[in-house]
């Protein structure tokens, strides 16, 4: 008898909030959005694949000041009756502190990170913006890790695929999740920060590589169209409602 595909679910976790008073300062290299103010959210995600769990991004640390979440990922997982040691994989979109802040709380997880970012973390000196401290456990050989040079089919059945989308950082990744009932989802990481720059292929002035960013946006949008996927821009609070409110999971 053919083995059935394990159930896959997707749950949004709150990993911080912040108001950006003028997004024209950093989030465009073409002088767009003059004086525009936007709220940002910092979203993380729990992916359940059968009996296995994966985290996508780990948000701000609890000591990050005003942007920090009110409840840690560990405590949110406890509400779902999931223990830190049950997390098998942690996929990191990129090495910035607002996506890696709570990574040290999951030393037993296998880290999945783009090779360009891993190389930037290990460089001397490390690349600007890399939250090196969060990766110490894996840098010292204490945990399993894989530096991804291409896409990664995490569970081997095409239900969760980390997609290479460089540009924001050299090893930036996004992720695709296929759900039986809710359909396909594409989570951006920081490929785009809000709808206005996603729609216009806008590039933040602090991105690592402009050309790679634009090419990654093109790839991501074509994939979204072909998959008829729901696109979730992780920093845009207008996209929070695309998934059920915590603790409910999309299935």
Predicted regions and their residues:
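Metallo-beta-lactamase
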Residues: 1-82, 86, 182-189, 225-230, ...
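Short, electropositive alpha-helical surface patch
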Residues: 64, 72-74, 110-112, 167, ...
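Cap/insert and terminal regions of metallo-dependent hydrolase folds
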Residues: 174-176, 181-251
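Active-site metal-binding motif and surrounding structural segment of the metallo-beta-lactamase
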Residues: 66-113
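Histidine-centered catalytic micro-motifs
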Residues: 90-100, 165-172, 233-237
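Short Gly/Pro-enriched turn/cap motifs at secondary-structure boundaries
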Residues: 34-38, 163-168
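Active-site metal-binding loops of divalent metal-dependent hydrolases
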Residues: 15-16, 58-61, 95, 116-117, ...
């Amino acid at each position: 008898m053919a083995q059935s595909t394990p159930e896959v679910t997707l749950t949004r976790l709150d990993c911080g909030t912040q108001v950006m008073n003028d997004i024209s300062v950093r989030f465009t290299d073409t002088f767009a959005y003059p004086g525009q103010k936007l709220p940002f959210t910092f979203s993380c995600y729990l992916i359940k694949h059968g009996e296995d769990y994966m985290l996508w991004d780990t948000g701000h640390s609890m000591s990050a000041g005003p942007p920090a979440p009110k409840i840690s990922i560990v405590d949110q997982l406890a509400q779902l009756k999931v223990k830190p040691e049950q997390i098998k994989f942690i996929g990191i979109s990129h090495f910035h502190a607002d996506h890696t802040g709570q990574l040290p709380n999951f030393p037993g997880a296998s880290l999945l990170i783009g090779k360009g970012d891993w190389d930037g973390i290990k460089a001397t000196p490390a690349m600007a913006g890399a939250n090196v401290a969060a990766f110490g456990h894996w840098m010292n050989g204490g945990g399993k890790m894989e530096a991804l040079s291409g896409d990664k089919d995490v569970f081997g059945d095409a239900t969760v695929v980390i997609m290479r989308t460089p540009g924001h950082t050299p090893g930036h990744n996004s992720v695709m999740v296929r759900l039986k009932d809710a359909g396909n989802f594409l989570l951006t990481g920081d490929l785009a920060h809000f709808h206005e720059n996603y729609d216009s292929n806008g590039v933040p002035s602090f991105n690592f590589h402009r050309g790679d960013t634009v090419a990654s946006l093109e790839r991501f949008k074509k994939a979204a169209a072909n998959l008829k996927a729901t696109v979730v821009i992780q920093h845009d609070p207008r996209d929070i409602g695309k998934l059920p409110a915590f603790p409910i999971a999309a299935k």
